[in-house]
UniProtKB/Swiss-Prot annotation:
Record-given protein name: PTS system mannitol-specific EIICB component
Chain residue ranges for the region called Disordered: 365-401
PROSITE patterns, alphabetized: PTS_EIIB_TYPE_2 (PS51099), PTS_EIIC_TYPE_2 (PS51104)
Classification via PANTHER family: MANNITOL PERMEASE IIC COMPONENT, PTS SYSTEM MANNITOL-SPECIFIC EIICBA COMPONENT
A GO-annotated cellular component: plasma membrane
Source organism (scientific name): Staphylococcus aureus (strain MRSA252)
The PTS EIIC type-2 domain, residue ranges: 17-349
Localization, UniProt: Cell membrane
Subunit structure: Homodimer.
Lineage: Bacteria, Bacillati, Bacillota, Bacilli, Bacillales
Length: 512
């Protein structure tokens, strides 16, 4: 294997790990927001203080949210059975450290117990006497839950206490030394070229929850989510950009600032690598502003939208929130404008930059791909139904795997029994939701009413999936998750000619 291929393989594995972390947190963001509203509104210094209702905030962050995260992690590994026992075992960590929200502990315990439950069943089920299945299933789960709850209480809890102490001390040291803005030097480039949701939800969300539970709010929720640096880049393109980049920057700015989908500005930075300086300085400015004003959120600002920022702003600190976003935007814009004004035009166009971003992130971006319109054709050979046995031998060659499943030849498949189409993306929320909504509208206009269209994360694709639509860089992972399904790859969730081809095939099968 060449060094380049090895690096790509490592990148895919790290991206998949980051995706797994965010898949535990993102489905539970609604619970975080509900807790944040209760804390912001009903606590003593909230918008409408209520002593009785304020008592909800503590148990929610101490028990409810860690249990939800543990359940999500266990379910990702071993469906409901893994999720239930994972949540059970996590109680050991929670009870051992009742004063610290055990989000990190839940993120460890959930997948671990889910995996152990899976291995336990694989060991016991083939040896279970006929007629004793329910007894063995229930007792094996109960015994594992018992053992892991004790292990969580006695082993993982002390370890988590030590880890949380080290991390808290590190964050506090940065805050007291007024060095927290320096974190942006790592965060801003990392989220553009590699990990996005994993940084916010895998690192800042659990640490921020611990800080918010103790101090009432956390600045950590603002570090990655501030829409200002990205808006500054896009404003610079609106004024000083040329061609396609300038024309598309207006729509991108609206999607980014109000929709909170940050990945849409990543290609604009990659077109001119010097713009990394602009987003870093913009991010540092935002963090420095919030640190100087003592600003923070009570719950995660997800997605990183200005609307979410407005809704999450604590009482009496709305102007502080506006100031942080405005200054981050201003600094990013000024630096980007200077770079664009006094440096040469990039050799790389927007389409190439989008492709580069998707390669480094190990995933395709529908909102970024919306900026360009291109379809790439690859040679295809056989239907997915005949390829399940060959998948394992192609795991290390994503292109061959896609060829083997005819992912870009819509006409190569039989759609007679299809009644469910699933759009799958990394997190299962933003881009796949937009793609599913768009295809539902196309089906409605075409009079196709007997096919359901939904969206999900790749990690949560059901084993009995019939037809899965993914962006090309993610299709190999989707195939490994659901090898029996028909898989279609697109370059752009919102603008692909393959949808019309799919509609034509479905109409033919319906008329046959």
């Amino acid at each position: 294997m060449s060094q380049t291929e090895e690096k790509k393989g490592i990148g895919r594995r790290v991206q998949a790990f980051g995706s797994f972390l965010s898949s535990m947190i993102m489905p539970n963001i609604g619970a975080f927001i509900a807790w944040g509203f209760i804390a912001a509104i009903f606590i003593d210094n909230g918008w409408f203080p209520n002593k009785d209702l304020a008592t909800l905030a503590g148990p929610m962050i101490t028990y409810l949210i860690p249990l939800l995260i543990a359940f999500s992690g266990g379910r990702l590994i071993y469906d409901l059975r893994g999720g239930i026992i994972a949540a059970t075992a996590t109680m050991g960590v929670i009870v051992a450290l009742p004063d610290t929200p055990m989000l990190l502990g839940a993120m460890i315990m959930g997948p671990l117990v889910g995996w152990l439950m899976k291995k336990t069943d694989q060991l016991i089920q083939p040896r279970t006497p006929q007629g004793f299945e329910m007894l063995f299933n229930n007792f094996s789960a109960g015994i594992l839950g018992f053992i892991m709850t004790i292990a969580g209480f006695k082993i993982l809890a002390p370890l988590m206490k030590f880890i949380m102490h080290i991390l808290s001390v590190a964050v506090e040291a940065l805050v007291h030394a007024h060095l927290l803005p320096l974190v942006s030097i790592l965060v801003e480039p990392a989220k553009i070229v590699f990990l996005n949701n994993a940084i916010n939800h895998g690192v800042f969300t659990p640490l921020g929850a611990d800080q918010a539970a103790k101090a009432g709010q956390s600045i950590l929720y603002t570090i990655e989510s501030n829409p200002g640096p990205g808006l500054g880049i896009l404003l610079a393109y609106m004024i000083f950009g040329k061609g396609t980049a300038k024309a598309t920057s207006y729509g991108a700015g609206i999607i980014h600032f109000f929709g909170g989908i940050h990945e849409i500005y990543f290609p604009y930075v990659l077109m001119r690598p010097l713009l990394f300086i602009a987003v870093i300085l913009g991010g540092m400015t935002g963090v420095a502003t919030y640190q100087a004003t003592g600003f923070g959120f009570k719950s995660p600002a997800s997605p990183g939208s200005f609307i979410v920022y407005c809704l999450n702003a604590p009482r009496g600190e709305f102007l502080h929130m506006l100031l942080g976003v405005f200054l981050a935007t201003l600094v990013s814009f000024v630096v980007a404008a200077l770079i664009m004004k006094f440096t040469k035009e990039p050799k790389q166009d927007l389409e190439a930059a989008t492709a580069q971003m998707e390669t480094t992130k190990g995933k395709k971006s529908s909102v970024a791909s919306k900026l360009v319109s291109s379809d790439k054709n690859v040679n295809t050979e056989e239907n997915a139904s005949g390829n399940v046995s060959e998948t394992s031998s192609l795991d290390d060659d994503p292109e061959a795997l896609l060829d083997n499943y005819n992912t870009e030849d819509v006409d190569a498949h039989n759609y007679n029994n299809i009644n469910h189409v699933i759009f799958a993306c990394d997190a299962g929320m933003g881009s796949s939701a937009m793609g599913a909504s768009m295809l539902r509208n196309k089906f409605k206009k075409a009079g196709i009413n007997d096919i359901t269209v939904t969206n999900t994360a790749i990690n949560q694709l059901p084993k009995d999936a019939q037809l899965v639509i993914t962006q090309k860089k993610l299709t190999d992972r989707a195939i490994k998750q659901t090898p029996n399904a028909i898989h279609i790859s697109v370059d752009n969730f919102l603008n692909s000619p393959r949808y019309e081809e799919l509609l034509n095939n479905l109409k033919k099968d319906d008329q046959a």
